[in-house]
Amino acid sequence: MILPLILVLYLLSTAAYRLWLHPLRNYPGPCWWAVWRVPYLKGTIRGTIVRDIQRLHNQYGPVVRIAPDELSYITPEAAKPIYTSSPEFPKDPMHLPPFHNGAPGILAADYAHHRRYRRLLASAFSEKGLRAQQGMIQSHIDRLMTRLQGNCSSGSLDMTVWFNWATFDIIGDLAFGEPFGCLERMETNPWIASIQGNVKSIPILNALRRYRLDRLIEFLAPPRLLEMRRRNAQFTAEKVDRRLKHATTTRGDLWDSVLADPPDGEPPMSRAEMVSNASAIVLAGSETSATTLSGCLWLLLTNPEYLQQLTERIRARFSTATVIDAQTVTQIQGLQAVLDESLRLYPAVPMQSNRIVPPPGARLAGSWVPGGTSVAVQQFAACRSPTNFHRPDEFIPERWEKEGEFINDRREASQPFSIGPRNCIGRQLALAEMRLILVHLLWHFDIELDRRRMENMDWMAVQGIWILWDKKPLWVVLKNRST
């Protein structure tokens, strides 16, 4: 009888403290979320947390207390100190993926390791490095177009799969000097499935870690997701070991610079660090680009006036596909606005990484936040907020022209590649890849949505989010262009 009473008193006293005495007590938000992290973890595991937080911001405003020790923001004023301060706000370890080999990759590393990784990888992702890769990227896009031409007459195609195949082959060539053969064999490499399963397992594993149930992971986590996680680690390690056997050979991949003499004073990457970074780069360099292309295509297909306008501009600009390259596509009027608007409505990574406010605290968006608080700017909620964008839920690329009724849009709220020293190192590669694939697709084909197979589905609205989007099939009818 005594133990249950003690438990009840503990729960009541904890709730009372967090509601009325905690340093974050004055921040708005639902009481249940402020008292326990259970609603947050429930949404995370179910894949609804991004939209849950959006609803909370719509109800409570630009800053919301979404857990006992966590604040969510949607304003650009909060983003700058959170992601660009020096010294930096460190990443929240409870929001990071567990390291399967003890070595964090570039996405999860602390300040010192991240800085070293970035310097070692810098040349591969520099403008010079990307120019050297243009021929390789173009060869995969050519193969994508050839495969689509050979298969489009048999019925509609799921473009989410085709985009994944193309971007996975490209990042495979860049990361390891050889493609994964998805387009060649027209089948999904097992690594793609393992990557997607691994990402989906992270929220569950983090929830167990938060309550110190790590040792029970084998019993509590879904076996299929654990197997995906194990296979992802195995595939990555095998690829890195295969590359290390040819460490002295120049293969035109990103490891050329990593395996060469490191910059002055920088220790070389260990094998474990190479494995962790390879896993991060393959994920970030394939899944995110494929996601953006899928979202962009959906938005164009459901807003046909913009699809027609962009298609006409592309075909007027290029008389033949052979003159389409990374430089000429940047000259197409409205192309970047279409991508920017797609990234606003459908950011490939809907949630920014959480940071910990260092002691004693910091002023964020005009209010004091105590040290130790976990904070983040939520991309999806920020980009869909009427406080940042006029007509926020509509696909209107001309808002990026910064005039007319959209002149007061807070475009800096949309940061799909993040900001600060930890912004996406592959931003230029991703943009070049997406521009080229989209332009080639609209140059070669007349496209329309297969509404029968889509069954009037709101493709974006039905997707769950486990760090990344759980994309559903996007059935598209492709016809070789008539003129």
UniProtKB/Swiss-Prot annotation:
Q: What is the top EC class of this enzyme, as a single word?
A: oxidoreductase
Query: What UniProt keywords apply to this chain's record, in alphabetical order?
Result: Heme, Iron, Metal-binding, Monooxygenase, Oxidoreductase, Virulence
Which amino acids does the record list as binding heme? C424
Keyword Metal-binding appears in the UniProt entry: yes
Co-factor(s): heme
Among InterPro entries, the record links this protein to: Cyt_P450, Cyt_P450_CS, Cyt_P450_E_grp-I, Cyt_P450_sf, Cytochrome_P450_monoxygenase
Q: Extract the PANTHER family matched here.
A: CYTOCHROME P450 (PTHR24305), CYTOCHROME P450 MONOOXYGENASE ASQL-RELATED (PTHR24305:SF210)
What family is this protein classified in? Belongs to the cytochrome P450 family.
**The protein's name in its UniProt record:** Cytochrome P450 monooxygenase stcF
Tell me which species this is from: Emericella nidulans (strain FGSC A4 / ATCC 38163 / CBS 112.46 / NRRL 194 / M139) (Aspergillus nidulans)
What's the gene? stcF
